[in-house]
Amino acid sequence: YISKGAKVTYVEKHYGEGEGTGDRILNPTTIVHMEEGSYCEMEMTQIEGVTSTVRETEANLGKDAKLVVTEKLMTHDKQHATSNITANLNGKNSILQIVSRSVAKNDSTQSFHPIAVGNEKCRAHIQCDSIIMDNAKVASIPEIQANHTDAAIIHEAAIGRINNEQLLKLETFGLDEEQAEAVIVEAFLS
């Protein structure tokens, strides 16, 4: 619960490593209730090493509340990651911004499903950008719902591979293809 006028920064970072042979499973659930005029910034990062994850995030925004969510995700090998975010903009003049950036490599799979529900005069923007490599699979399913005539909700989604021109430019500086890809991925997720 975030009280009236309060400001909260929530940071969650995950990286799995080790010599063990078992699966590394991570299924976090975050629920936030935001009172009038409150502000919350969530930064959720998962960079490799987690075999399977299902992230559930729910937010309920009151009057003049603002929520900013930044999600960064990288999967590789046969890893699977699902992220479900539901934000209910219940208060007048509430604001939501979700930015998701992800990279899927090898045979990994990703699914991102953000939902913005405008129940009052509000503004929301969802942006999902993914880089897909090798044999990976990525699904981006932004969902918007307006239950009020003054709800202004926008979503954008883009999935694509690394541009060959970017690789070539970095290779002219002496990087090999693998190093060039690493530079592009790091910059994309930063």
Where do the language-model regions lie?
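Conserved beta-strand/loop scaffold segments within soluble protein domains that form the structured core
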Residues: Y1-L175, E186-S190
